[in-house]
Amino acid sequence: MIMNKTTLLHEGKAKKVFLTDDADLVIQEFKDDATAFNNKKKGSIADKGVVNNAISCRLFTMLEEHGVNTHLVEKLSDRDMLCRRLDIIKVEVVVRNIAAGSLVRRYGFTEGTVLARPIVEFYLKDDDLDDPLMIAEHAVALGVATMDELEVLKSRAGAINDVLKKFFADRRLKLVDFKLEFGRHKGEILLGDEISPDTCRFWDLDTDEKMDKDRFRFDLGGVEDAYTEVQRRVLELD
């Protein structure tokens, strides 16, 4: 499909979103910019946008095949994804399978502990407030989502986790945790944003080597190689 970018609708940390000639569709352009710690650390990862677009398009397509409705229409180019325009729900949904990151800092888990069951968390999508952890009642009180919508988000996140865990295990990757964003579209709730090493923690199944943005966060080196290896496993091992 030929689709032209018109007006820049939004520019975030990792992507730009453009309006198109069709009011129902937007183009999501993936950037190489990298940030961590709520924008306190900034940098760039070579070809990150190309890698993340490729991974996200493959994963969205695979999730659609498993009955998960997403905003993906099609991959337009190396960096551009054509998407349905969503009314974004200002709730970041985080699913945790293995203790890492803020779960370790906040609750004292030992990093690498496999959780007895996945934990689903809600965070308010607000950079000025550093995306605070919240319970469902907070989201309802703030008017960002209804209780029914939050139940859908939690259920949908669990179903997505089941599909992704198996997909990545088949590719010798542990899905430690990941962030999802959803939006409203014509009365439906669709999965939006991206699924990539920017939004997921991936550890090698055999060595526990970190293969995600933690390599950038904590100056571990080999960031580009890790992203490229995840892309290889996602795309080449079908």
Curated annotation (Swiss-Prot):
Keyword Ligase tagged: yes
One GO MF term: ATP binding
InterPro entries xref list: SAICAR_synt/ADE2_N, SAICAR_synt_PurC, SAICAR_synth, SAICAR_synthetase, SAICAR_synthetase_CS
First-level EC class: ligase
EC number: 6.3.2.6
Keywords: ATP-binding, Ligase, Nucleotide-binding, Purine biosynthesis
UniProt-listed GO biological process terms: 'de novo' IMP biosynthetic process; cobalamin biosynthetic process
Pfam families recorded: SAICAR_synt
Ranges that cross the membrane: none
Pathway(s): Purine metabolism; IMP biosynthesis via de novo pathway; 5-amino-1-(5-phospho-D-ribosyl)imidazole-4-carboxamide from 5-amino-1-(5-phospho-D-ribosyl)imidazole-4-carboxylate: step 1/2
Reaction catalyzed: 5-amino-1-(5-phospho-D-ribosyl)imidazole-4-carboxylate + L-aspartate + ATP = (2S)-2-[5-amino-1-(5-phospho-beta-D-ribosyl)imidazole-4-carboxamido]succinate + ADP + phosphate + 2 H(+)
PANTHER family the record matches: MULTIFUNCTIONAL PROTEIN ADE2 (PTHR43599), SI:DKEY-6E2.2 (PTHR43599:SF3)
Family statement: Belongs to the SAICAR synthetase family.
Protein name: Phosphoribosylaminoimidazole-succinocarboxamide synthase
Organism: Chlorobium phaeovibrioides (strain DSM 265 / 1930) (Prosthecochloris vibrioformis (strain DSM 265))
